[in-house]
Amino acid sequence: MLFRSKIDETYELASIKQSKVRYVANEAVFSFTQQGKTIYDVIFRISNNDVAFKYKIYPQGETLSCVVKQEVTGFAFPDGTTTFLCPQSKPMGGFARTSPSYETSYTADDVAGKNGWGEGYTFPCLFRNGDNGWVLVSETGDRKSVV
């Protein structure tokens, strides 16, 4: 099932450069069902400068949690894209076995497609598509019920 809507919201924050912000976007919700029940949604929001998506997983009966066994979300960038990335370190390493602790160094203008130290990269990730601009890939969460 597909549901589309237009988002037009205004909010205020006291501690940012522009305290009153108007957010306009289009939203599409793709629902995935099994045996007539919605299992999860993939929700996309697209605005003039942003693309965002999230997964919403629905409780099944009395079960209020789930196990994600594999994550296959990915991003593809054009050939020649360079990066400004922080490699993810192996877990339980470094000082007092506190890794990953976001204290590794960012590498500038590396070619896209490498895999850091074999563990991927830490968000946020910044990609440069030559003279065509930059792409920031990051993560955020807004509620416990949204994965």
Residue ranges and their predicted role:
Residues M1-V147:
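N-terminal accessory beta-strand-rich subdomains and adjacent acidic, glycine-rich linkers
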